[in-house]
Structures are given as structure tokens and as C-alpha cells.
Amino acid sequence: GYKTQTVEVGGRTSFNIVLVEEATAVDEVVVVGYGQVKKSDLTGSVASVKAEKLTDIPANSIDGLLQGRVAGVQVVNSSQDPGASSTVRIRGNSSLNGSNAPLVVIDGFPWGDAGDLKQINPQDIVSMEVLKDASASAIYGSRGANGVILITTRKAQENVTRITLRQQTTISGFSSELNLWRDPVLMAMLSNESSINAGLTPIYIGATNANGVYYPSIAELQTTWTTNTRWDDLVFRPTPVSNNTTVQVQSSNDRTMFQASANYYLDNGMYIEDTYRKYGGNFSVEHKLLDNLRMKASANIPSIKRHNNGGLAYWRNPIFPVYDDNGDYWLYGAQDYSHPLALTDLQKNDSKGLDIISFASVNWDVLPCLNVMAQFNYKHGEQITDKYFPKKYSETGVFNDGYGSIDNWKDDNIVFEAYATFDRTFAEKHRLTVMGGYSYENYQSRSSSLAAKGFINESLGNENLAAGDSETYSIGNGSYKTELVSALTRINYTFDNRFLFTFTARADGSSKFGSNNKWAFFPSGAFSWKMHEERFIRNLNVFDVLKIRASYGISGNQGISAYQTLSRYGQHKYFNGGKWVTAIGPGYQSGYTGQDGIYALWSGIPNKGLKWETTAQVDLGLDMSFFGNRLNVTFDWYDKRTSDLLRERNIAPSSGYDKMWVNDGEIRNRGIELTIDGVAFQNRDWRVGGTFVFSRNRNK
């Protein structure tokens, strides 16, 4: 945008006016739940990350784009495995056993929790909004209890045809040389000294141990011993390379906008043969049926292939060779639990996944002040995991004479939503926006697993589970279904563009709870005062924006598995004492006590009194802008309390049960958030600026 300028006419008839760009678009449109508002009209705590900032640093995942960008949002990389998901939290953990992940909404579609972000190509993203306080997220009810991340993807521009190729290559490496043993002599000396100090017999004495493995003496290591294997050089990639390639086609005319893209992402892990591949296709079309009637449809289809290699180079003793005299992998005794190259070649740990996410909507401007929106979303996911661990080698130290398994699951999620929005200004100073809607969600999941041990022939691995010992066969399957029905409303009132009020309410009914607690009501309210619109503030000539905010709201959490309020009855068959034993009882068998696994514990005990977790949150905020919006400051203080925590409680074994779900306990999160964003210099070609983000959360 450009700055507003005032020029005195006087007696002049011609003027030279130079457009000056605004450093920050204060009145840019920000996406909120079930609608859009101007940034200056926000009453809740909403952080926006636009396209120009998303391209500042390369990232192969959306959680990588969020990391360090938004105050109060914590992104933790818990694993360095290729394709691994990060843990995303907004203002701390609010639940012990329920979900703590924020809801992700893409182009209006409730996608899932933040663990699904890896399915989305970050190069398709235009902007992200993070709803942090209850007044902003309560409109999503139980699904928004942990905050909401709203993502807007790329769309075609009007009357433009464009083909875009984006290529991103990332080269990784260890920041320093791994701290592994390089000197076998020093290693042996320290090992012997440690054993002696502990009252044990040292092993580096030139003798063969109980496993038949010869450990040389220190004198041998100093003179005649020649084996000093650099396991890290054999197992680790020196410079893992990742590539993310996207081809996008956009086209439009006066009535239709079309966009399609194809993506290939390859992430090579630190270990050899450790890879993650993602193939993705995405398209969207928006068509104006009439001047006041629009339809939109889109689909996103990511396919994932994962080949997992655990490595274990840091476990391996450098005095051990890679191969024996016959050219086979060297064995530590009869069985070996840490030979990294043998595990790389002989074990199997692969997974394949496919997701189909589709979206369709109709948008009707019934009147200039009344809009009706209906949308249908369907998401299908499936995955199969193949594993085989050979007889002689294991990365866990547990040997089953060969172990193979096949696990698969699939789920289907259907969401239908319809809402109407009334927006009108009365007597120039009074603006009223009212939204009311309905939401229905149906989720179904099904899984199955096959496993066997004791393989006679390993040539086909888990492709021939019948080669395993029939007495070790394990077969399991399960399915469940949940439904969520909701009614929602939001009322925004603005007086004289200075005082803004927001009220939201949502009623959720979940099939996970019993009849007495099935429904929950989640209200919120917020107030904002644009002090910079007051004359006494304008006369100071200091603030471009000075706004205070206050909000309070309640949200809920239904993050438990299905059927915990219902009595369940199941059968479990297991091999014990040389024979098959069938256990029949309430639910499923979850554990044993006593010798030989004779005593079964069950987890089918219902709790019909289970109810929603509820989170109440208060937020106080301050927004300021200076120097023609070149310096922007946002500060928030919040206090968030979650009560009636959903958690599993242990039960006395004498009852025959293991655990049951209860409402018990409270969690409190308090904190402050500060964001300072500044632009030192900006013209048509250059922009020099920076962002400072600080947040502090205390959890109790």
C-alpha cells in the first residue's frame, strides 16, 4: 500500500505528487475463523505471517516456516529423521493425555492437527495466521482449544497465465566431527580402569569372552592389532542433500481462475539408505457462475515413501571388523545387535502413505449485506508399514529368530459446514457483522496388523509371513467411528471506527461422551479500542497505531479415543505355557501381572461420567506502530487454565482392570509475548528490516 498524503491546493493548478510506499500494510486483510477482517479491526490475539516473510529463509516444511516467526508458538524438532514431524505448541501444553496440537485449517478446510503439516508443500503457501487467544479460536470450539493455524494457499491472479518452477536444494552436515572413539588403545585403557574400579574383570586382557569374541590386550592393540574401523565414515552421509521441486501453472479470465501444481520432495537422512520421498499434486478452480454466485473446488494428493535406517554407528566398537574371513558380515557371537551395515542391508522398515484431500464450496451473495457459504470437505488417508528383522542381527537387542510384520490403516474424514454472514453499516458510525452457522464432522478409521516370529526361511522376509512359526502368529484389527455436531455464531460491532466488540459462541456435541455430557458450550468475548483514532492521541504525532485489546473465552478438548464411556467386550488369544490361551473379557487385554503372564488385565471399564476438558483464557494486548508504520510493536499477556483434565488413572490389579479414563486435575499456562518488527529502508527494489520475537510461558 501507499501512504495517505495531504496537499494544500492554494493557488496552484498543477501538482507533483510522489507515491510513498507504506512500510507495513496496516489494513491488510487477515483470515480469521469463518471470515476475514482488516488487521486494524482485530480484537483477538492473531499473528499473521505473509508471503514476503515466508520466502526469507528456505524451509522444507511448514513447521519450519513457523519456527521463530510467531511469539508464543513453539516448534520443536524432536527427531532428525527425514520427513519427521515437529511438535508445534501454542502457549504451552494444556492437556496431560489429550491432544495438545493446534488445529490446522487450509483454505477454510479443517485439515487436522499440526502433525499433518508435512503433507503440505510449503512452496504452495501464501500466508499463515495463528489464532492464539480464546476469542479468536473459540469459534472452532473443541477443535480450537490448543490454538488454530490458518493457511492460505496460492491462487491464480485475474487475467494472468503463469508457469512457475521453484527449486530448493538444502545441503546439510555435522557442525563438528562426531565425538567417537578414534584411539582403540586409549579406549581399552579407560575401559579396563573403569571395570577394575567397579570391582569387575577387565575385558581387554587378550582373552575370549562367553560369546566367543576375542578382546585383545592393550599390548596387542599397541603393536599387532590392525583393525580400527571408522564406523561413522561407513554409515553416515558426509553431506546429506534434500531437493524440493515444484512446477505450478496458473491461468484465469474474467470468470474462472485455475491453478495446478506438481511437487517432488526428496529428503536424504544422515544415515545411508535413510530416505523420505513425497510426490504431490494440487489443483484448485474457482468459477463465477453468476455475478453473485461463485463455486470453488480443490484437491491435494500427497504420496509418501519412507525407507528407515537407524544407523547405530555410535554403538560399534572400532576393534570389530566389518566382514569376517569369508566375506560375510562379522558377528558378535551367535547373534549381533549393533552391526550397522548388516542392519542396513538385511532389515526392512518401509512405509508408504497416500492422502486425498478434496474441498468444494458455494458462495452466494444473496444481498449486498448478506452472504451464504456452504462447503464440503473429504479427506482420505492410508498407510502400510512393512518390517522384517533378521535372525542374527537386531537393532534393539531382542532376537526372535526372525520377526516380520505388516501393519496398515486407513481413515476417512467428512466435514460439512454452512454459514451466513450479515454485514451492514448504520448511520455511518455503527457497523454490525453477524455470522451464524452449522458444522458436521464424521470420522472413521480402520486398521489391521499381521506378525510372525521364528522364520524357517528368510529369503522373502515379511512378504511370506507363513514361513514363521505358527505358534507365534499375531493378528489384530480394529475400527472406530466418531461424530461431532456444532452450531456457531460470531457478532462483531464497531462504533465510530474506534471501539470494537466481538462475541463468539459455539456448541459442540461429541459422540465420544455419554448422553449427560455430550454437549458443551464455548463462549468468548473481546474488546478493542483504537486509541490512535482519538483526537488527543493524533495531536501527539507519535503513534500511527495505538490499540489496546482485552479478551476472555472458553474452549474445550475431546482428545480421547472413542467408546471410553461405553461398556466393551472383547477376546484376546495368546500363546502361553506351550498352548494357545483365549482370554475373554470387557474390552481388550492390556497387561499381565504374576508369573508367566497368567493373569490378564482389561481396559474396557467405562466411565459414563466423562466430560469435556475446558480451557478458560484471558488475554490483554497492546498494538503500536511508529514512523509511518515502519516500527511495529505487539505485546500480549495471557493466563490460560485447563480444568477437568482427561487422563488415564491406574486401577488396583485386584479389580481385574488396568486403567480407566477420568476427569481429574488442572493445568495453568501464563506468559507474555513481544514482537517488534521494523523496516529501516524500503523502495521498489530493496527492503531492509528485521523482526524480534520474545515469549515466555510458565506451565504449572
Label each region the model flagged.
Residues 84, 277, 391-397:
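Short, conserved phosphate-binding/catalytic loop or strand-edge motifs used
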Residues 1-282, 294-296, 357, 612, ...:
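Short, small/polar-rich motifs associated with maturation and membrane association
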Residues 54, 59, 100-101, 284-293, ...:
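Extracellular/periplasmic, surface-exposed regions of secreted and cell-surface proteins
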Residues 104, 322-323, 493:
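Short aromatic-centered micro-motifs
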Residues 306-319:
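Low-complexity intrinsically disordered tracts that form flexible linkers/tails across taxa
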Residues 326-329, 428-429:
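Detector for glycine-centered tight turns/loop "hinges" at secondary-structure junctions
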